Design a protein with these regions (language model features):
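Glycine-rich, flexible loop motifs
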Residues: 4
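Catalytic micro-motifs at enzyme active sites that drive phosphoryl/nucleotidyl and oxygen chemistry
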Residues: 7
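Function-dense linear segments that define catalytic or interfacial modules
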Residues: 11-125
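Internal maturation/activation junctions in enzymes
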Residues: 79-102, 106, 110, 127-206
């Protein structure tokens, strides 16, 4: 507890250090047949194989709140779909720091979609940042983004073909997607596949 208090205080004061849980990271790895995840970029939004990279994009959540404080899930999902397509196109246009990183990033077609302004959204809605309700909202928004991105990726793959290393990692990738779906529906721990530590599911009552 003392150590976590120190880490939490330091992260609040200057955004460092970050804590990464190696077992969990690699159990949610979509391409483990090609190697383990050893590290992330400094801000930790990108975790994947060594010598890969991706372009990042963040969707501003506050644009999906109306005057009454309601979050428009449909418009947000549509934005996630559009940005997934944009990032997919960007793979062939990006400038990478080395030929090896460019080659591997093309083989996996990695993209980085995220959101910004969660804190502002919660303030507008009058919800405490450190509350079960806030965590449920963050989980729900993440689930919509993740599910929409995977769905859009599948639609693109249907027309253009999957990324080069998909077949080699297909079973693991589909297992990870199934586990994401289970977390979104807050299933019992026994339903998860190959996880030592199961996630906290989304409580729809919050």
């Amino acid at each position: 507890k003392w150590l976590y208090d120190k880490i939490g205080q330091a992260a609040w004061a200057c955004a460092d250090p970050g804590v990464q849980f190696d077992t969990t990271i690699n159990e949610w790895h979509t391409c483990p047949k090609d190697g383990r995840i050893n590290a992330s970029n400094p801000c930790s939004e990108y975790m994947f194989l060594d010598d890969t990279a991706c372009n990042l994009a963040s969707i501003n959540l506050i644009h999906f709140i109306n005057d009454s404080g309601h979050f428009n899930e449909e418009k947000f999902a549509h934005a996630c779909e559009l940005m997934t397509i944009v990032l997919e196109i960007s793979v062939t246009m990006a400038q990478f720091p080395s030929d090896e990183i460019a080659k591997r990033s093309w083989e996996y077609r990695t993209l980085g979609l995220g959101f910004a302004n969660l804190g502002t959204l919660l303030m507008v809605k009058g919800i405490s940042y450190d509350s079960d309700e806030a965590r449920s909202i963050a989980g729900g928004i993440s689930a919509i983004m993740c599910g929409t991105a995977y769905e859009t990726s599948a639609k693109l793959a249907k027309h253009l073909g999957p990324f080069n290393r998909y077949e080699h990692n297909k079973d693991d990738m589909l297992r990870v997607i199934r586990n994401h779906r289970r977390a979104a529906y807050n299933v019992s721990n026994e339903e998860y596949e190959k996880l030592e530590i199961t996630p906290v599911g989304i409580d729809e009552n919050l």
